[in-house]
């Protein structure tokens, strides 16, 4: 199963709130993430930068389904105000995706 990684950036004054909210992610959102096939999902933080890593068979299909989900829409609104633009996101891209160049299982 493919692994994906991308970067987000938190506003400096929102780091504590971001971490607090991720200690209590809504159960309905967790269920939806699993339903669309996301697994082994981790979020790492260094300063303002977040690295999100997960496994997923069909990225575009899952992101489209998550985008239509009302629970996810509410979560995105509540979290969206915590972020700054990521400098390396290109026009037309949703995320600053990273290419996996090595993996040891």
Q: For each predicted feature, which ranges?
A:
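Tryptophan-centric aromatic hotspots in well-structured domains and transmembrane helices
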Residues: 26, 41, 75-76
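Ligand/cofactor pocket segment of small-molecule handling proteins
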Residues: 1
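Short, glycine- and small/hydrophobic-rich beta-strand elements in well-ordered beta-sheets
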Residues: 30-51, 55-59
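An amphipathic, aromatic/His-enriched active-site/gating alpha helix that lines ligand/cofactor pockets
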Residues: 36, 57-94
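Active-site-flanking beta-strand signature of metal-NTP-handling nucleotidyl enzymes
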Residues: 4-9
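Hydrophobic pocket/interface hotspot
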Residues: 18, 22, 52, 62
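Short amphipathic alpha-helical segments
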Residues: 14-38
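Charged phosphate-binding loop/patch that engages nucleotide di/tri-phosphates or the phosphate backbone
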Residues: 92-105
């Amino acid at each position: 199963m493919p692994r994906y990684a991308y970067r987000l950036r938190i506003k400096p004054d929102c780091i504590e709130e971001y971490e607090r909210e991720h200690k209590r992610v809504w159960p309905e959102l967790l269920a939806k993430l699993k339903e669309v096939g996301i697994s082994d999902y981790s979020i790492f933080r260094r300063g303002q930068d977040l690295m999100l890593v997960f496994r997923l068979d069909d990225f575009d299909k899952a992101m489209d389904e998550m985008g239509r989900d009302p629970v996810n829409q509410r979560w995105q609104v509540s979290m969206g105000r915590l972020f700054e633009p990521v400098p390396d996101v290109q026009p037309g891209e949703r995320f600053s995706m990273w290419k996996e160049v090595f993996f040891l299982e």
